[in-house]
Amino acid sequence: MAKKVVAIIKLALPAGKANPAPPVGPALGQHGVNIMAFCKDYNAKTADQAGMIIPVEISVFEDRSFTFVLKTPPASVLIRKAAGVERGSNEPNKKFVATITRDQLREIAQTKMPDLNANDIEAAMNIVAGTARNMGVKISD
């Protein structure tokens, strides 16, 4: 019989830099999970994506064991990286901070595709374009 899940914890952590300090320690500690084991596993799996924020979904079972699933980086992080800006506009649609091409948009959409609720790449591109627009990033043809 399958183990019973007692909690699902969602965190967004820097790749390869998880440590027992907050937010990881308190989130996992209250469920009795071995924090160091999670940190070592997470850091090993994300070592090749240094500098990115990687969301993780941790399933905690009643025997205090756990499994985790890595998600794709947030669209905003990928857009900022492609545009080469530190942060989005504080007045989106009035002040534009950068421009990205349709090719860059397609690349970001392909990266995000497993986590998006979209059936094809065009729908995924529209979702990512909306995020870019809300950040004050223009899309050029």
Swiss-Prot record:
Keywords: Methylation, Ribonucleoprotein, Ribosomal protein, RNA-binding, rRNA-binding. HAMAP family: Ribosomal_uL11 (MF_00736). GO terms for molecular function: large ribosomal subunit rRNA binding; structural constituent of ribosome. The lineage of its organism: Bacteria, Bacillati, Cyanobacteriota, Cyanophyceae, Oscillatoriophycideae. Part of the ribosomal stalk of the 50S ribosomal subunit. Interacts with L10 and the large rRNA to form the base of the stalk. L10 forms an elongated spine to which L12 dimers bind in a sequential fashion forming a multimeric L10(L12)X complex. One or more lysine residues are methylated. One of its GO terms (biological process) is translation. Gene3D superfamilies: Ribosomal protein L11, C-terminal domain, Ribosomal protein L11/L12, N-terminal domain. One of its GO terms (cellular component) is cytosolic large ribosomal subunit. Belongs to the universal ribosomal protein uL11 family. This is Large ribosomal subunit protein uL11. Forms part of the ribosomal stalk which helps the ribosome interact with GTP-bound translation factors. It comes from the Bacteria. InterPro entries: Ribosomal_uL11, Ribosomal_uL11_bac-typ, Ribosomal_uL11_C, Ribosomal_uL11_C_sf, Ribosomal_uL11_CS, Ribosomal_uL11_N, Ribosomal_uL11_N_sf.
